[in-house]
Amino acid sequence: WQKVLDNLKPGDYVFIQFGHNDEKADPKRHTDPETTFADNLRRYVRETREKGGIPVLFNSVVRRCWFVEKEKNDDDEKLRTTTFDAEEKINSDTLVDTHGAYAIVPRKIAMEMNVIFVDATRITHDIESQLGAVESRKLHMWFLPGEVASIPKGRKDNTHYNVYGAHIVANALADAIAEQVPGLKKHVCHYDYVVSAIGRGNYLCLQDAVDAVKVGEKATILILGGNWKKPVHTEGKKIKLVKRWGANISRD
């Protein structure tokens, strides 16, 4: 936080979201929702304002939990390296809340301190619920053994998003931010495909993204950095290429 504060300039927006790790039993990470957790949020808001920044509070995105008795989860970080052990036992027809007071307190602090608030819990709850118990897996690092070459033993992580899920949630939250902060609306842009050679998009290769666009379809492709060959086979496709982070396209 001190690094953020040291670099904060008047007029900067500071997006503040905590909760997932505060819920853990580990005393090195745990905070109490009504005391230490709330006090930390107040501190971040207060110190942001003291530097001339504009705080925006979010509550936590939901976990994908369709279990009345949810699976034991001591540490979300461990899920990044776990392998697929068995099919899950879905026993709820509605998404089950795992955050409790940690999702409520940020809203209370926002009202108390007159801070802009984005309800990330509700937004992501709706996204997961609309997809349903099985289809919502495709948002997360949830892969069967052999489904993804780089994760041969599979993975069953209901907390962290894969690239597709991150893209869906980021789009939804960007729209929500624009609603709460009209001054930022002009900066919100949506893209159909994102290309990044270092894995920050849903395609590693520009040509692959172009090939994914159907003939007759309109598509906007964001290119994040890198040097790329001009794509071919674009006939009949209405493609707009947007370059960021020094991206360059050449004929060679």
Question: What kind of region is each of these model predictions?
Answer:
Residues 192-222, 227:
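Acidic Gly/Asp/Thr-rich repetitive segments characteristic of extracellular carbohydrate-active
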Residues 3-167, 171-182:
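Alpha-helical cap/lid subdomain in secreted, periplasmic
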